[in-house]
Amino acid sequence: MAGAKEIRTKIGSVKSTQKITKAMEMVAASKMRRSQDAMESSRPYAQTIRKVIGHVANASLEYRHPYLEEREAKRVGYIIISTDRGLCGGLNINLFKKAITDMQTWKEKGAQIELAIIGSKATAFFNNSGAKVAAQVSGLGDSPSLEDLIGSVGVMLKKYDKGELDRLYLVFNQFVNTMVQKPKIDQLLPLPKSDSEDMQRDHMWDYIYEPEPKPLLDALLLRFIESQVYQGVVENLACEQAARMVAMKAATDNASNLIDDLQLVYNKARQAAITQELSEIVGGAAAV
């Protein structure tokens, strides 16, 4: 059994770590609330433009944008959103597993895979795995802006325009609630038609485009892609802070349990030392 002094040192070390994890839990909780506000502020725009795009995809347009055209999927692209920092449980690895499973499905069909990566954790993971990475960006901080994402998104859109990609997917963590974050894969291109049967059945009209459909749709479809990627980034950020808060709370609770266990061991060691000293005193007195 370790000595009382050694155990006391361990208890002090665990208490110091517990203070750090408690502080990180409180910081993550504060950042999560701000991230949730940003996510909820941008979500109505992202959802509305997605509905508009759903109508456009179902419409009989006089101008057919290339993003609306289905083609054989020989080259598939993914925009993968991860965190820049760790200590957030299995958030990133669960996302990577889902992405890899989907990629493997396409590879079995003979498709080539190309990635654009947002976040240092995904950058390190996929670069080390030998994946073909066309663009990467990290260090977006706690308040990412659309301007920070345009470069990586633009690379993938240019490849799609040139026919170097036939499908484009967005991979991110969807914020369900504080305890649940779900990895999700959304199809960006070609434009997914609405999943709503009611919309498809009732959609018997078209928009009136002013001045011309081509420039309007070109701008609208670009905004759609940018808004979906940005929404994925802010949702992933809210997931990161929620996962970190939960992980740090678990670490703090585990530290409390460990301190209790060490305190019990310390008390036993101290009791054994006192018993030994008393035995030595009694033995010495008897010898006299």
From Swiss-Prot:
It is found in: Cell inner membrane. It holds the Pfam family ATP-synt. The keyword Transcription regulation does not apply. One of its GO terms (cellular component) is plasma membrane. The keyword Repressor does not apply. Keywords: ATP synthesis, Cell inner membrane, Cell membrane, CF(1), Hydrogen ion transport, Ion transport, Membrane, Transport. It is a peripheral membrane protein. One of its GO terms (biological process) is proton motive force-driven plasma membrane ATP synthesis. Gene3D superfamilies: 3.40.1380.10, ATP synthase, gamma subunit, helix hairpin domain. CDD domains: F1-ATPase_gamma. GO terms for molecular function: ATP binding; proton-transporting ATP synthase activity, rotational mechanism. Its main location: membrane. InterPro entries: ATP_synth_F1_ATPase_gsu, ATP_synth_F1_gsu, ATP_synth_F1_gsu_CS. F-type ATPases have 2 components, CF(1) - the catalytic core - and CF(0) - the membrane proton channel. CF(1) has five subunits: alpha(3), beta(3), gamma(1), delta(1), epsilon(1). CF(0) has three main subunits: a, b and c. Produces ATP from ADP in the presence of a proton gradient across the membrane. The gamma chain is believed to be important in regulating ATPase activity and the flow of protons through the CF(0) complex. Belongs to the ATPase gamma chain family. This is ATP synthase gamma chain. It comes from Vibrio cholerae serotype O1 (strain ATCC 39315 / El Tor Inaba N16961). The gene is atpG.
